[in-house]
């Protein structure tokens, strides 16, 4: 019986010794190692291709200047900012489309009696020449909606960043400014129209006033007074007499 046990043990040991070695213990240069190397190279190549495709789908981060310019459109504005009437200005309009001008290039302004985002408009007092009535303006002015104002001077004389696009209730509104400026500093050769050039020097100039606009302060939107062109006036001075 003992001889049978010894025989079985010897056969078992011989079988283990004759078994093929595992791939983990295969010497360098064996077929198993070559397959693993090929697999690793293929995986590395696929990884490089994947990384290139990822870089193409996700380009490198933009420069700081580009991120700063585009950050304003991503800032969500609290609707409560528009509920205070003292922040509303008749020359500032928030709209999803360019506001129209009335016919004959008359000046128009934004009506904000009920809602800041209301796009109703009304014609203001005529500031351009009305030749058919025999009435003329001392200075010729032009009024336009300015859509892409990014910088302005605040009430303290410091430059501020103006928000071009405003994200409000998941809708992007553009901030428009109704500006008026002189068409020509000298509508007539002598200066302002209708001024006695024999006794007065005159010229037309654009004046500015302050309006409340939505500006950027860090990463937050805030109301500030900024300067915009609002009128064209005539400046006169008495001519000095030569004695």
Swiss-Prot record:
**Signal peptide interval:** 1-18
The protein's UniProt keywords, in alphabetical order, are: Cleavage on pair of basic residues, Disulfide bond, Glycoprotein, Growth factor, Lipid-binding, Metalloenzyme inhibitor, Metalloprotease inhibitor, Protease inhibitor, Secreted, Signal, Toxin
Q: Which Gene3D superfamilies match?
A: Cystine-knot cytokines
Q: Does the keyword Repressor apply?
A: no
* Ranges of biased composition (kind: Basic and acidic residues): 47-66
Region annotation Disordered: residue ranges?
47-69
Q: In which tissues is it expressed?
A: Expressed by the venom gland.
Q: At which residues is glycosylation annotated?
A: 148
What the entry lists under Pfam families is as follows: NGF
Residue ranges the record assigns to the propeptide: 19-125
The cross-references to SMART domains, in alphabetical order and at most eight, read: NGF
Main subcellular localisation: secreted
Which Cys pairs are S-S linked? 139-204, 182-232, 192-234
* Compartments (UniProt record): Secreted
One cellular component term (GO) for this entry is:
extracellular space
Tell me the domain of life: Eukaryota
- A Gene Ontology molecular-function term? lipid binding
Its GO biological process annotations read: cell surface receptor protein tyrosine kinase signaling pathway; modulation of chemical synaptic transmission; negative regulation of neuron apoptotic process; nerve development; nerve growth factor signaling pathway; neuron projection morphogenesis
- Quaternary arrangement and interactors, per the entry? Homodimer; non-covalently linked.
Summary of the function given for this chain in its UniProt record: Nerve growth factor is important for the development and maintenance of the sympathetic and sensory nervous systems. It stimulates division and differentiation of sympathetic and embryonic sensory neurons as well as basal forebrain cholinergic neurons in the brain. Its relevance in the snake venom is not clear. However, it has been shown to inhibit metalloproteinase-dependent proteolysis of platelet glycoprotein Ib alpha, suggesting a metalloproteinase inhibition to prevent metalloprotease autodigestion and/or protection against prey proteases.
What family is this? Belongs to the NGF-beta family.
Protein known as: Venom nerve growth factor
Source organism per UniProt: Oxyuranus scutellatus scutellatus (Australian taipan)
